[in-house]
Design a protein with these regions (language model features):
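An N-terminal hydrophobic leader/cap segment in hydrolases
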Residues: 15-89
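Alpha/beta-hydrolase active-site loop
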Residues: 152-173
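Hydrolase active-site cap/lid region
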Residues: 192-249, 256
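Conserved alpha/beta-hydrolase "acid-adjacent" motif
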Residues: 273-279
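Catalytic histidine-centered segment of alpha/beta-hydrolase-like enzymes
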Residues: 300-311
Length: 330
């Protein structure tokens, strides 16, 4: 107490006057507000703060399209429950859980879901692949569903999890061909996995929907849309992710896609406000593979292309996977 009194008494009077003016004018409150707001946004967006958050339930029950997707997906899953096997891998001490729908083929599609989504979300996207003769793997990403983990790392750690799942399919189920189907963050994870030297050659292709250049651009577009883009807020949110996960929002698929060598199908909406069309075109142009196709949809919200135009979506997917039919006689 004496030390504190000595400290306060040693502070010149003019310093107290300046501090009083700053507090009274609210200038000091702005940075405090930014710090609090950035942590709130980060925790709401990329941190699992309770076991119930991001569980195996619809993420947007108030949205009719989301609920229609969920309903159709659940119908498909229930109709094929006899083909389902519960699967589990561990990577870096994190338990990861999924469901493998084995229809007797030696090839499988792995659905890489977006932020907030569990394996239940993947059912809806599995339908055209199952119709085309592929087994299906849907998984709870880390920090989602039944899987362990606290943070969504926007594809970075998830990409290493994806590689672990591919090795599981190869070693435990005899799968010889894998295709990634990634939505938003899942698309980023697919690109990171496929440009990682440790990725098995079993992965033969990549389908993306709503792929962004880096998560930072998507985050800024979200903040602008919701009128929450306060000056200085984004750098603090970016700092939260760096502090908690060691990864940067400013690094993304646009930095590595030139190393992509497998066939690529990009599905993208001209109305996407988060993963904007100009960046989608740039990602496509930069992709290193010569076997690539970009299919534009005139309408469709972010991650909502299949429910908006199911026939066109499924046709594009089936044409893409058709090229693998002669490579493996199944």
């Amino acid at each position: 107490m004496d030390t504190l009194l000595q400290f306060f008494s040693s502070v010149p009077t003019f310093v107290w006057i300046i501090l009083g003016v700053l507090v009274g004018s609210g200038i000091l409150m702005y940075p405090i507000t930014l710090i609090v707001a950035s942590n709130m946004v980060y925790n709401a967006t990329l941190r699992r703060t309770s076991p119930e958050k991001w569980g195996r339930v619809p993420s947007f029950p108030e949205d009719p399209d989301s609920m229609k997707m969920d309903g159709l997906g659940m119908e498909w899953a229930e109709a094929h429950r006899d083909a389902m096997k519960e699967v589990h891998v561990v990577r870096d001490g994190v338990n990861l859980y999924g469901e493998y729908y084995d229809f007797g083929h030696k090839r499988a599609v792995m659905i890489l879901s977006g932020r907030t989504e569990s394996l239940r979300y993947g059912y809806f996207f599995a339908i055209p692949y199952a119709e085309a003769g592929w087994n299906i793997l849907v998984v709870d990403p880390r920090a989602h569903g039944k899987s362990d983990g606290e943070f969504n790392t926007v594809g970075f750690e998830e990409s290493l999890d994806d590689i672990a799942w591919v090795k599981h399919l190869r070693d435990c189920h005899g799968v010889r061909q894998v295709i990634f189907h990634g939505i938003c963050i899942g698309a980023a994870g697919g690109v990171y996995a496929l440009t990682n030297p440790d990725c098995p050659e079993t992965v033969k292709g990549l389908v993306t929907e709503g792929m962004y250049p880096n998560f930072g651009e998507s985050m800024k577009n979200h903040l602008i849309e919701r009128k929450k883009m306060m000056w200085g807020l984004y750098p603090l949110i970016r700092g939260c992710m760096r502090r908690h996960t060691g990864h940067s929002m400013d690094y993304g698929p646009i930095d590595v896609i030139h190393r992509l060598e497998v066939p690529l199908l990009m599905l993208h909406s001209k109305e996407d406000p988060y993963s904007t069309p100009p960046y989608a075109q740039k990602l496509f142009d930069l992709a290193g593979t010569s076997d690539k196709r970009l299919v534009w949809f005139e309408r469709g919200r972010h991650s909502m292309l299949r429910i908006t135009d199911t026939e066109r979506y499924d046709t594009a997917v089936k044409e893409f996977v058709g090229q693998f039919d002669t490579a493996l006689h199944i």
